[in-house]
Design a protein with these regions (language model features):
Chain B
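Generic hydrophobic transmembrane alpha-helix motif, especially the helices
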Residues: 205-242
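Cytoplasmic-entry segments and transmembrane alpha-helices of multi-pass inner-membrane transporters
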Residues: 104-109, 181-219, 247-254, 380-392
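Membrane-cytosol interface at the C-terminal ends of specific transmembrane alpha-helices
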Residues: 175-194, 198-201, 232-269, 273-281, ...
Length: 334, 392, 275
């Protein structure tokens, strides 16, 4: 790229006749010194963020290495947690199972409720209530999980326990997985509480996506004489499908990382228990919260390995959510 | 084009709100026809619904008292009642108005029910926490600590001063760490868009998935376990800041991106260097959104228990120095008290929970106010005299 | 009319003095966006005391050319250019002039009014001073003078502390003009300043332009033939053939361009036969 000086060219009113083999000139002094300083300063801030965040991942990985080396592949299949024992015996199988089961219970409740609530706020609620309900959902999303957890522990679980006992008594004999020697501190109940926390955040995201459904198409559907439900199935749900998936995934990420509900509700048991109404279970997050105090050298490393595993799972889910959400384009999908 | 469109022009959007009598105010008093409010439902619809409800109720009653061997439980009764109501309602509307209408009606009921399940917890949570919290909250709750409180003390004795102070200090420190860094990163992402932008955005996105307990574990195993720094408030702030940073960065970037490019161009066209245009035009224009982002970030971490559980240590005495010595905070206070076997301790936990709830509510309201104050600052237009400047 | 001194400013002209403002000259300017050439070999001299209008159909490169005149063109990351732009004989792209100095001396008014929404009316006028770090003796006086020059003073004198967003579109555009004038530019570039405004506001802006033309060199891009005739004395007609960069087909005194153009394409365009 060669700079072309003004001396190299001639002004002409009829330029199409002149020869024009110009090259773009290189510009100088785009930035003042102060601007260079500003750029360097801001870039260093961004760099610090990058370094800090990367450091966490790297540090977790390094910290987890001794435990992973000790346990090998059995880390994924072992249920008990005794990393500081002789010989050390530990793995994330029970924790992961508990995490996934409680999250699954939570999502089975969360997704339909969140979709219903979003549709209710956007399409069914009176106009005057809409803003208030939206704020309420956003507010709910801000309430600390601790409060949901103690509320569940003291109000919801005692309330549900007789019903669960009744269900176990009625169905326990002949339906698989419904037996339980004792109820209350079960993965099901933990999942239920987690659902209460996940519903607001999921609703808030889904509602926002569904609200962006093209109004003229909705009105088109209504103008054809369709019912409200007809409009929802024809326009809004197809439009918001990926938003629903994305929002649910984010809710799932929240549910997987939830610590308090599981710590307070579950009767701790490091084993895989398919009978979800029965007491006992553990999740990764609550396992870390409970075990860290007594953890020795290898124990801490094992906890970091568990934390890393959890992080990888939540990261993968977030990533998928972003992928799905980005694919959503108005009018796409039938 | 014209910014005041929204308030100057009569609303052209919400077509439903225009009323026939709005422009009659100025004219001579004439007979205004009664205002009609179109309704989507009719009285017969109500009757159908009510009838279905009654029919389902008696059917359920019949089932439970005469036909089934189940013990009668109110909850089960309600569930069966609801389950029977749906098909009855469907059949009734289908008979009267045809299949699509029946389906629509059925779905309306289902969606309403679903929404109820979402809104019920909030009412019950706030109500229950308020009820139990108010029982123990006395003024001394804000002035005393748990230092001299024994297992036999009454629930109204002692207080959470040490936890409140701890929460405030830790929150302030976490904000002081996360917000400048986050906003700086956001400025980089949106205004400079340099080569670091892609990796930074990638890791920030990834870190929003970081479970809060893992942030605590990170600080614990990096600093506390190797005895580099003992458990203290600042370490709790660090863990909270790690949780805040990606959220603040991403929200702030979104807020900055909304600032119209024409404003940046206008600033640059006046001869401003980049840094001044960002500092004096872009950031002030986005300040409402930035404030909202910051406050919501604070609301998000103020109730986080898992990370502070591992990092601040927890204590029953007042420690105003966040940099050394164990420090308590509200979530930790609630968590330790609620797990106690003493009834009075548990009672006290609800007091802490109520305060925490109020703090979150306050932050939320603050965020709303900051957000709505943003677009077009509405200040009292006072009739100043020509050329005189005020309010500087 | 009194205009206070600002750093770097030459004294303001008396009523009968030679017109103030800088002489701007584009010399053989070509522009690219990436590898696409959008403008080729444009040379226009924009004299002080003369309003120069750039006309032509959409997409012919007039706005691009205008943006090269105060180095706004390079804000687009893939934009490049060749040739040079001389302000009173100095190349604004050369090493001698600082970028920010160039933009301060060559102001710009945009198509859509863009007052800073976070500032009051007065702060908006004085924004350029703050943004360039310029100190003035009497800020209030400068604000008043700038607003007077833009013809907005009487409308806003009682609400200088009100947010700028509360003004009408035409008032906002004149506020933007006042904002540009407050840093005492030598040249004022206007990129279709009236295209977003109603006819009344348009007329007010045109009056403002005519009042300003002896104080500052004005270059205006417009789609409105009548406007070009009303406000400008010099006129350049841009045209771009399909898939070719834009060029200046013809330029000269406005009267001649509109009454007796040399090029048939110019005649077609100014008589509304295409474009």
């Amino acid at each position: 790229m060669q700079p072309t000086g003004p001396e190299g060219s001639v002004t002409s009113d009829m330029p199409e006749k002149g020869p024009h083999a110009q090259e773009p000139r290189k510009l100088e002094a785009r930035l003042t010194d102060a601007d260079r300083l500003y750029r360097a300063f801001v870039a260093s801030g961004a760099g610090a963020t990058l370094v800090l965040i990367t450091l966490i991942g790297v540090f977790l990985l390094i910290g987890a290495l001794p435990a992973l080396r000790t346990a090998g592949l059995s880390f994924l299949t072992t249920q008990p947690w005794a990393p500081d024992g002789q010989p050390p015996k530990f793995g994330v199988a029970a924790m992961m199972f508990g995490t996934f089961v409680s999250a699954a219970v939570a999502m089975v409740i969360t997704v339909p409720v969140a979709v219903c609530t979003s549709l209710f706020i956007n399409e069914y609620a009176p106009r005057s209530l809409r803003r208030g309900l939206t704020s309420l959902v956003d507010l709910m999303a801000a309430i600390p999980s601790l409060i949901f957890a103690i509320w569940g522990l003291f109000l919801l679980v005692p309330l549900l326990q007789p019903i669960e006992d009744w269900a176990v008594a009625q169905f326990g004999g002949w339906m698989p997985l419904m037996e339980a020697s004792a109820t209350g501190g079960s993965l099901f109940n933990a999942g239920l509480i987690i659902a209460c926390m996940a519903i607001p955040i999921t609703t808030s995201i889904i509602r926002e996506v569904l609200a962006q459904a093209p109004r003229h198409e909705c009105e088109g559907a209504l103008a054809l004489g369709g019912t409200r439900w007809g409009m929802i199935t024809a326009v809004i749900l197809p439009f918001g499908r990926s938003g629903i998936v994305g929002g649910s995934m984010l809710g799932l990420g929240r549910a997987l990382g939830e610590t308090l509900a599981a710590t307070l509700i579950l009767s701790i048991a490091f084993e895989i228990k398919p009978r979800i109404l029965e007491n006992g279970g553990i999740t990764v997050a609550s396992g870390i919260a409970i075990e860290f105090r007594d953890a020795q050298e290898l124990g801490l490393s094992a906890l970091m390995a568990a934390g890393l595993a959890l992080f990888l799972v939540t990261f993968a889910i977030n990533f998928l959510a972003a992928l799905v959400a980005n694919r959503s384009r108005p009018g796409a999908g039938a | 084009m014209t910014a005041p469109e929204t308030k100057a022009l009569p609303s052209t959007s919400g077509t439903g709100e225009r009323r026939p009598d709005t422009d009659a105010g100025a004219g001579p008093p004439r007979k205004v026809p009664p205002r009609r409010r179109p309704r989507a439902w009719r009285w017969t619809d109500m009757m159908e619904t009510a009838g279905s409800l009654v029919a389902a109720f008696f059917l359920t009653w019949l089932l439970f008292t005469r036909l089934l061997p189940f013990r009668v439980m109110p909850v089960a009764f309600a569930v069966v009642w609801y389950a029977l109501f749906l098909p009855i309602h469907w059949l009734v509307t289908k008979d009267g108005q045809g299949r699509p209408a029946a389906k629509d009606r059925l779905v309306t009921v289902l969606i309403g029910t679903g929404a109820m399940f979402a809104f019920a917890p909030i009412v019950f949570v706030i109500g229950y926490v308020g009820y139990r919290g108010l029982k123990v909250l006395r003024p001394n709750f804000f002035t005393e600590t748990m230092q001299i409180v024994g297992p036999l003390s009454k629930a109204t004795e002692g207080g959470a001063l040490h936890s409140i102070i701890g929460t405030l200090e830790q929150l302030a420190l976490a904000t002081a760490i996360a917000v400048p860094l986050g906003v700086l990163t956001a400025v980089y992402l949106s205004e400079i868009q340099g080569p670091l932008a892609r990796p930074v955005r990638l890791v920030a996105d990834a870190m929003t998935a970081l479970p809060s307990i893992v942030a605590g574990l990170f600080v614990y195993s990096l600093l506390i376990k190797p005895h580099l720094w003992l458990q203290s408030g600042i370490l709790g702030s660090l863990a909270l800041a790690i949780l805040m940073l990606p959220t603040v960065t991403i929200t702030a970037e979104q807020v900055l991106r909304v600032v119209p490019g024409s404003l940046r161009e206008a600033a640059l066209a006046l001869g401003a260097p980049y840094w001044r245009s960002v500092l004096l035009v872009v950031l002030p224009t986005a300040r409402a959104g930035l404030a909202t982002a910051v406050i919501l970030g604070m609301a998000r971490v103020v109730g986080e228990t898992a990370p502070v559980l591992m990092t601040t240590g927890g204590t029953t005495v007042l420690n105003t120095n966040p940099f050394s010595g164990h420090q308590d905070n509200l979530p930790l206070f609630v968590f330790t008290q609620i797990r106690s076997s003493q009834e009075t301790q548990v009672e006290r936990a609800w007091g802490g929970a109520l305060i925490l709830l109020v703090v979150v509510l306050l932050l939320f309201v603050l965020a709303r106010i900051a957000g709505s104050a943003g677009s077009g600052r509405r200040r009292a237009r006072f009739p100043g005299r020509g050329g005189q400047r005020r309010g500087r | 009319m009194t205009v206070p001194d600002v750093q770097h400013t030459r004294p303001m002209p008396e009523a009968d003095a030679r017109p103030a403002g800088g002489v701007l000259e584009g010399v053989d300017v070509s522009c690219w966006f990436g590898s696409r050439k959008v403008l080729e070999g444009v040379g226009i001299k924009m004299d002080a005391g003369v309003v120069t209008a750039l006309i032509g159909p959409s997409g012919c490169g007039k706005s691009t050319f205008l943006r090269t005149l105060n180095r706004m063109h390079e804000l687009v990351p893939i934009a490049t250019l060749a040739g040079s732009v001389l302000l009173d004989g100095d190349d604004i792209y050369g090493a001698g002039l600082r970028l920010t100095e160039v933009r301060r001396r060559i102001g710009m008014v945009f198509q859509k009014p863009n007052p800073f929404p976070a500032m009051t009316i007065a702060d908006n006028v004085a924004a350029g001073l703050k943004l360039t770090g310029t100190k003035v003796r009497d800020r209030d006086e400068l604000i008043e003078a700038s607003l007077r020059r833009a013809g907005l003073w009487n409308e806003v004198r009682n609400r200088l502390d009100a947010p700028a967003g509360g003004l009408s579109g035409g008032q906002q555009q004149r506020l933007c003009i006042a904002r540009s004038l407050a840093v005492s530019p030598d040249v004022l570039l206007m990129d279709e300043p009236c295209s977003a405004l109603d006819p009344t506001s348009t007329r007010r802006i045109e009056e403002t332009i005519l009042e300003l033309k002896d104080q500052v060199t004005i270059v205006i891009v417009t789609h409105n033939m009548q406007q070009a005739q009303r406000v400008s004395q010099h006129c350049a007609f841009f045209l771009a053939a399909e898939n070719e960069p834009g060029r200046v087909v013809e330029q000269g005194p406005t009267e001649q361009i509109f009454s007796d153009p040399e090029d048939p394409r110019t005649a077609d365009y100014v008589n509304g036969r295409f474009g």
